[in-house]
Amino acid sequence: MDHAIYTAMGAASQTLNQQAVTASNLANASTPGFRAQLNALRAVPVEGLSLPTRTLVTASTPGADMTPGKMDYTSRPLDVALQQDGWLAVQTADGSEGYTRNGSIQVDPTGQLTIQGHPVIGEAGPIAVPEGAEITIAADGTISALNPGDPANTVAPVGRLKLVKATGSEVQRGDDGIFRLSAETQATRGPVLQADPTLRVMSGVLEGSNVNAVAAMSDMIASARRFEMQMKVISSV
């Protein structure tokens, strides 16, 4: 079998992976705080005893685009936006701590604050609020609750968001969309980040996704054309 088939097959496989990444980005074009996933391709010459006439393809520049998204004013008390390099701490499915830029906080049926189903972590663990209470979030992340029918001067703090600071190179996205510390960062900063008291949030504001839907659609079309070309190479060899 001609080695060109393997070359084209490898390129087609990587193109499919690139299409999957682009499709995921498009699907999250309206997800608050979403960071577009990067996936580029690069040539890898085949080295060996044969002539240097074969070049394979592999993925490069994995990671996420940390460019901030635009701010949308929602006036919803439980929506918060953070400064650049600021993150909200959440509890992942395995109980470990993860980080997100998605500030769309929800209240589940048990009164626990969640983001995309993940419990929001405060400085003393997951945060719960009284049922039916009016919730406000201060700039420093302090969450206060006013029970129905109570006078305004009885507002009481129920917790404080754990706000942490990390650069894009210090975190890695998981399959669940939540970011976690890289191994290198854990070696220098510990298994979890400490709360940063200097960080501030804007209540009633959401950071939008940084996905450029038009550019992503163009990338999807270009990937489809590359895949079609690679299939023609395979069928003609």
Language-model segment annotations:
Residues 1-237:
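Amphipathic alpha-helical polymerization modules
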